[in-house]
């Protein structure tokens, strides 16, 4: 009966809030409260802007920034991760939902809610079954390339709001063509508002805080005011539109935003909708998880804390389900907000819950004031935010380090820009998996020899070493499994056919952590064929777990040679000269 009752440690592992709440005190409350104020100030305009990017009503951005933050505070393990709407996921949402319904319709909003629910379920299932390791198969350079291209697409897609024109498109060519075709319809007042806001926000990022500090202002207050730059832009441009009736001059505004707390919403369970959204939900889940965990791990390392990736899946899954049930759309951990949260002094996930309270108050009290907010201001907020995502230096870095990685990154960027975000992210995931399979299917194999005067064996192409014509010593620098077993077979056969004096082949297995069934069958075949050539097969430096598995098969009994503890032992046994020299 006791086995059915989880221990306190097990409960705390699945409910991290029970861990950090035990040491919560007034000082921690103060730190979390200050961080929440700063992040709330930053999140209000961002949530409105990202809803615009997703093609959704502004209030859905606010809704996606309330209950999801509370859910993450309960289930998440990062002390500083700030969950909410983010640019890339908003773009992916627009791409997925835009194929099913027209923007501004109830069907479009319902599809976005359903997408959040599906993403949450996928993340939860991955967390329950501890599938977080699957994210390791995604190449970070490839994902960086996708995010860079997405940043370019996002910024380009918002130019229509800066110019005050109509423009459509799912890729860079379509967007630019549509923009150029409608430039004659540019609204000059909108353009002035948009450009001025972009310039102001870029200056706020780098110049406002130093300027405030130069006046003698306290660093903490200067930091808060600098983070409030986007809010200042919202206030000033909204007042300008209201005072001068600029909406009557063609400046497009947000319009009526319903006030109140998020309503309880129910996602669609229509099988047709689920089948259409499944791939998008899966990709959003994976991309969101990879970026979220990357940010969380980086920030946790700075305070010598740790996160649990599988529990992060649960936390993000709960956040997305909470978003769906409260009228929001897919969310994940935001890089910029998380860094701000960390720098502002957040000590626990409670900072996120306090931020949710701030957003809820904004949804209750401030939404009537957003009626005259220009869409150009929100577009400027998005453009400035996503420019930090654009990093084309990944191309030069991969070119210098690995041409294969460069080709994958370039293909991902190119296809994302030319074909759109859905093709781009699918390509990125596929290329990541192909890169992994390509690299592991062609493991590095080095022929090794004895370094004179030592017991060390090194690559004959890199060091001056001693070898023996009767012995072919090979070091395998990869685990052996179905994808690379044939490569090893071909390598050995090519060498022994070309080098007739060989009587012994020694496989140095110091880097082999695993041998699967396919690789075992290949070793058995190598052993059999070499025996037919009068050549003995030996193993050296086999790790314990690998040896345990080999012992459960008939391979060791059929092995024509021996298993040596070290490569030096093999050299002593197989080359009498080494034993006579007694090198050490």
Predicted segments, located by residue:
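Active-site-adjacent beta-strand anchor residues
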Residues: 145, 539-540, 564
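Transmembrane helical cores of multi-pass ion-transport proteins
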Residues: 1-454, 468, 522, 554
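Generic hydrophobic alpha-helical segments
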Residues: 179, 488-492, 570, 574
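Intrinsically disordered or compositionally simple regulatory linkers and C-terminal tails
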Residues: 1-9, 574-584
């Amino acid at each position: 009966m006791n086995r059915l009752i989880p221990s306190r440690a097990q409960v705390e592992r699945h409910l991290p809030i029970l861990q950090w709440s035990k040491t919560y005190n007034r000082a921690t409350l103060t730190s979390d409260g200050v961080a929440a104020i700063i992040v709330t100030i930053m999140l209000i305009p961002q949530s409105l802007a990202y809803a615009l990017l997703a093609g959704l009503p502004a209030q859905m951005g606010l809704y996606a920034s309330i209950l999801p933050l509370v859910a993450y505070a309960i289930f998440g393990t990062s002390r500083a991760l700030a969950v909410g709407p983010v640019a890339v996921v908003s773009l992916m949402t627009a791409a997925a939902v835009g194929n099913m319904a027209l923007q501004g319709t109830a069907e479009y909003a319902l599809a976005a809610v359903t997408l959040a629910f599906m993403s949450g379920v996928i993340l939860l299932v991955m967390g329950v079954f501890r599938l977080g390791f699957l994210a390791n198969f995604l190449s970070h350079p490839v994902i960086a390339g996708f995010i860079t291209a997405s940043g370019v697409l996002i910024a380009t897609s918002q130019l229509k709001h800066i110019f005050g024109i109509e423009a459509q498109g799912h890729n860079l060519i379509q967007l630019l063509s549509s923009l150029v075709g409608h430039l004659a319809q540019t609204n000059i007042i909108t353009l002035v508002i948009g450009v001025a806001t972009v310039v102001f926000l870029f200056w706020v990022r780098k110049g406002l805080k130093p300027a405030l500090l130069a006046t003698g202002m306290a660093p903490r207050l200067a930091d808060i005011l600098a983070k409030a730059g986007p809010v200042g832009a919202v206030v000033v441009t909204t007042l300008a539109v209201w005072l001068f009736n600029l909406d009557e001059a063609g400046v497009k505004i947000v319009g009526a935003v319903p006030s109140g707390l998020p309503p309880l919403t129910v996602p669609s369970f229509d099988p047709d909708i689920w089948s259409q959204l499944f791939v998008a939900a899966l990709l959003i889940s994976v991309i969101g998880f990879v970026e979220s965990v990357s940010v969380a791990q980086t920030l946790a390392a700075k305070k010598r804390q740790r996160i649990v990736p599988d529990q992060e899946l649960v936390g993000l899954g709960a956040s997305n389900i909470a978003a769906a049930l409260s009228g929001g759309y897919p969310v994940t951990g935001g890089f910029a907000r998380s860094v701000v949260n960390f720098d502002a002094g957040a000590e626990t996930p409670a900072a996120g819950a306090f931020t949710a309270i701030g957003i809820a108050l904004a949804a209750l009290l401030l939404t009537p004031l957003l009626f005259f907010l220009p869409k150009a201001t929100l577009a400027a907020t998005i453009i400035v935010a996503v420019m930090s995502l654009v990093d084309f230096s990944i191309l030069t870095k991969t070119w210098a380090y690995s041409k294969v990685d460069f080709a994958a990154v370039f293909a991902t960027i190119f296809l994302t820009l030319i074909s759109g975000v859905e093709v781009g992210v699918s390509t990125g995931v596929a290329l990541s998996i192909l890169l992994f399979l390509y690299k592991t299917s062609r493991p590095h194999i080095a022929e090794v020899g004895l370094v004179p005067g030592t017991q060390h064996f090194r690559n004959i192409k890199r060091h001056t070493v001693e070898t023996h014509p009767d012995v072919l010593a090979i070091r395998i620098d990869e685990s052996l499994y179905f994808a690379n077993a044939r490569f090893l077979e071909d390598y050995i056969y090519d060498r022994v056919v070309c080098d007739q004096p060989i009587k012994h082949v020694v496989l140095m297995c110091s880097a082999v952590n695993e041998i699967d069934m396919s690789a075992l069958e290949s070793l058995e075949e190598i052993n059999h064929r070499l025996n037919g050539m009068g050549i003995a097969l030996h193993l050296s430096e086999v790790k314990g777990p690998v040896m345990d598995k080999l012992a459960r098969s008939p391979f060791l009994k059929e092995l024509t040679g021996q298993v040596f503890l070290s490569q030096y032992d093999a050299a002593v046994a197989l080359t009498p000269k080494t034993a006579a020299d007694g090198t050490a």
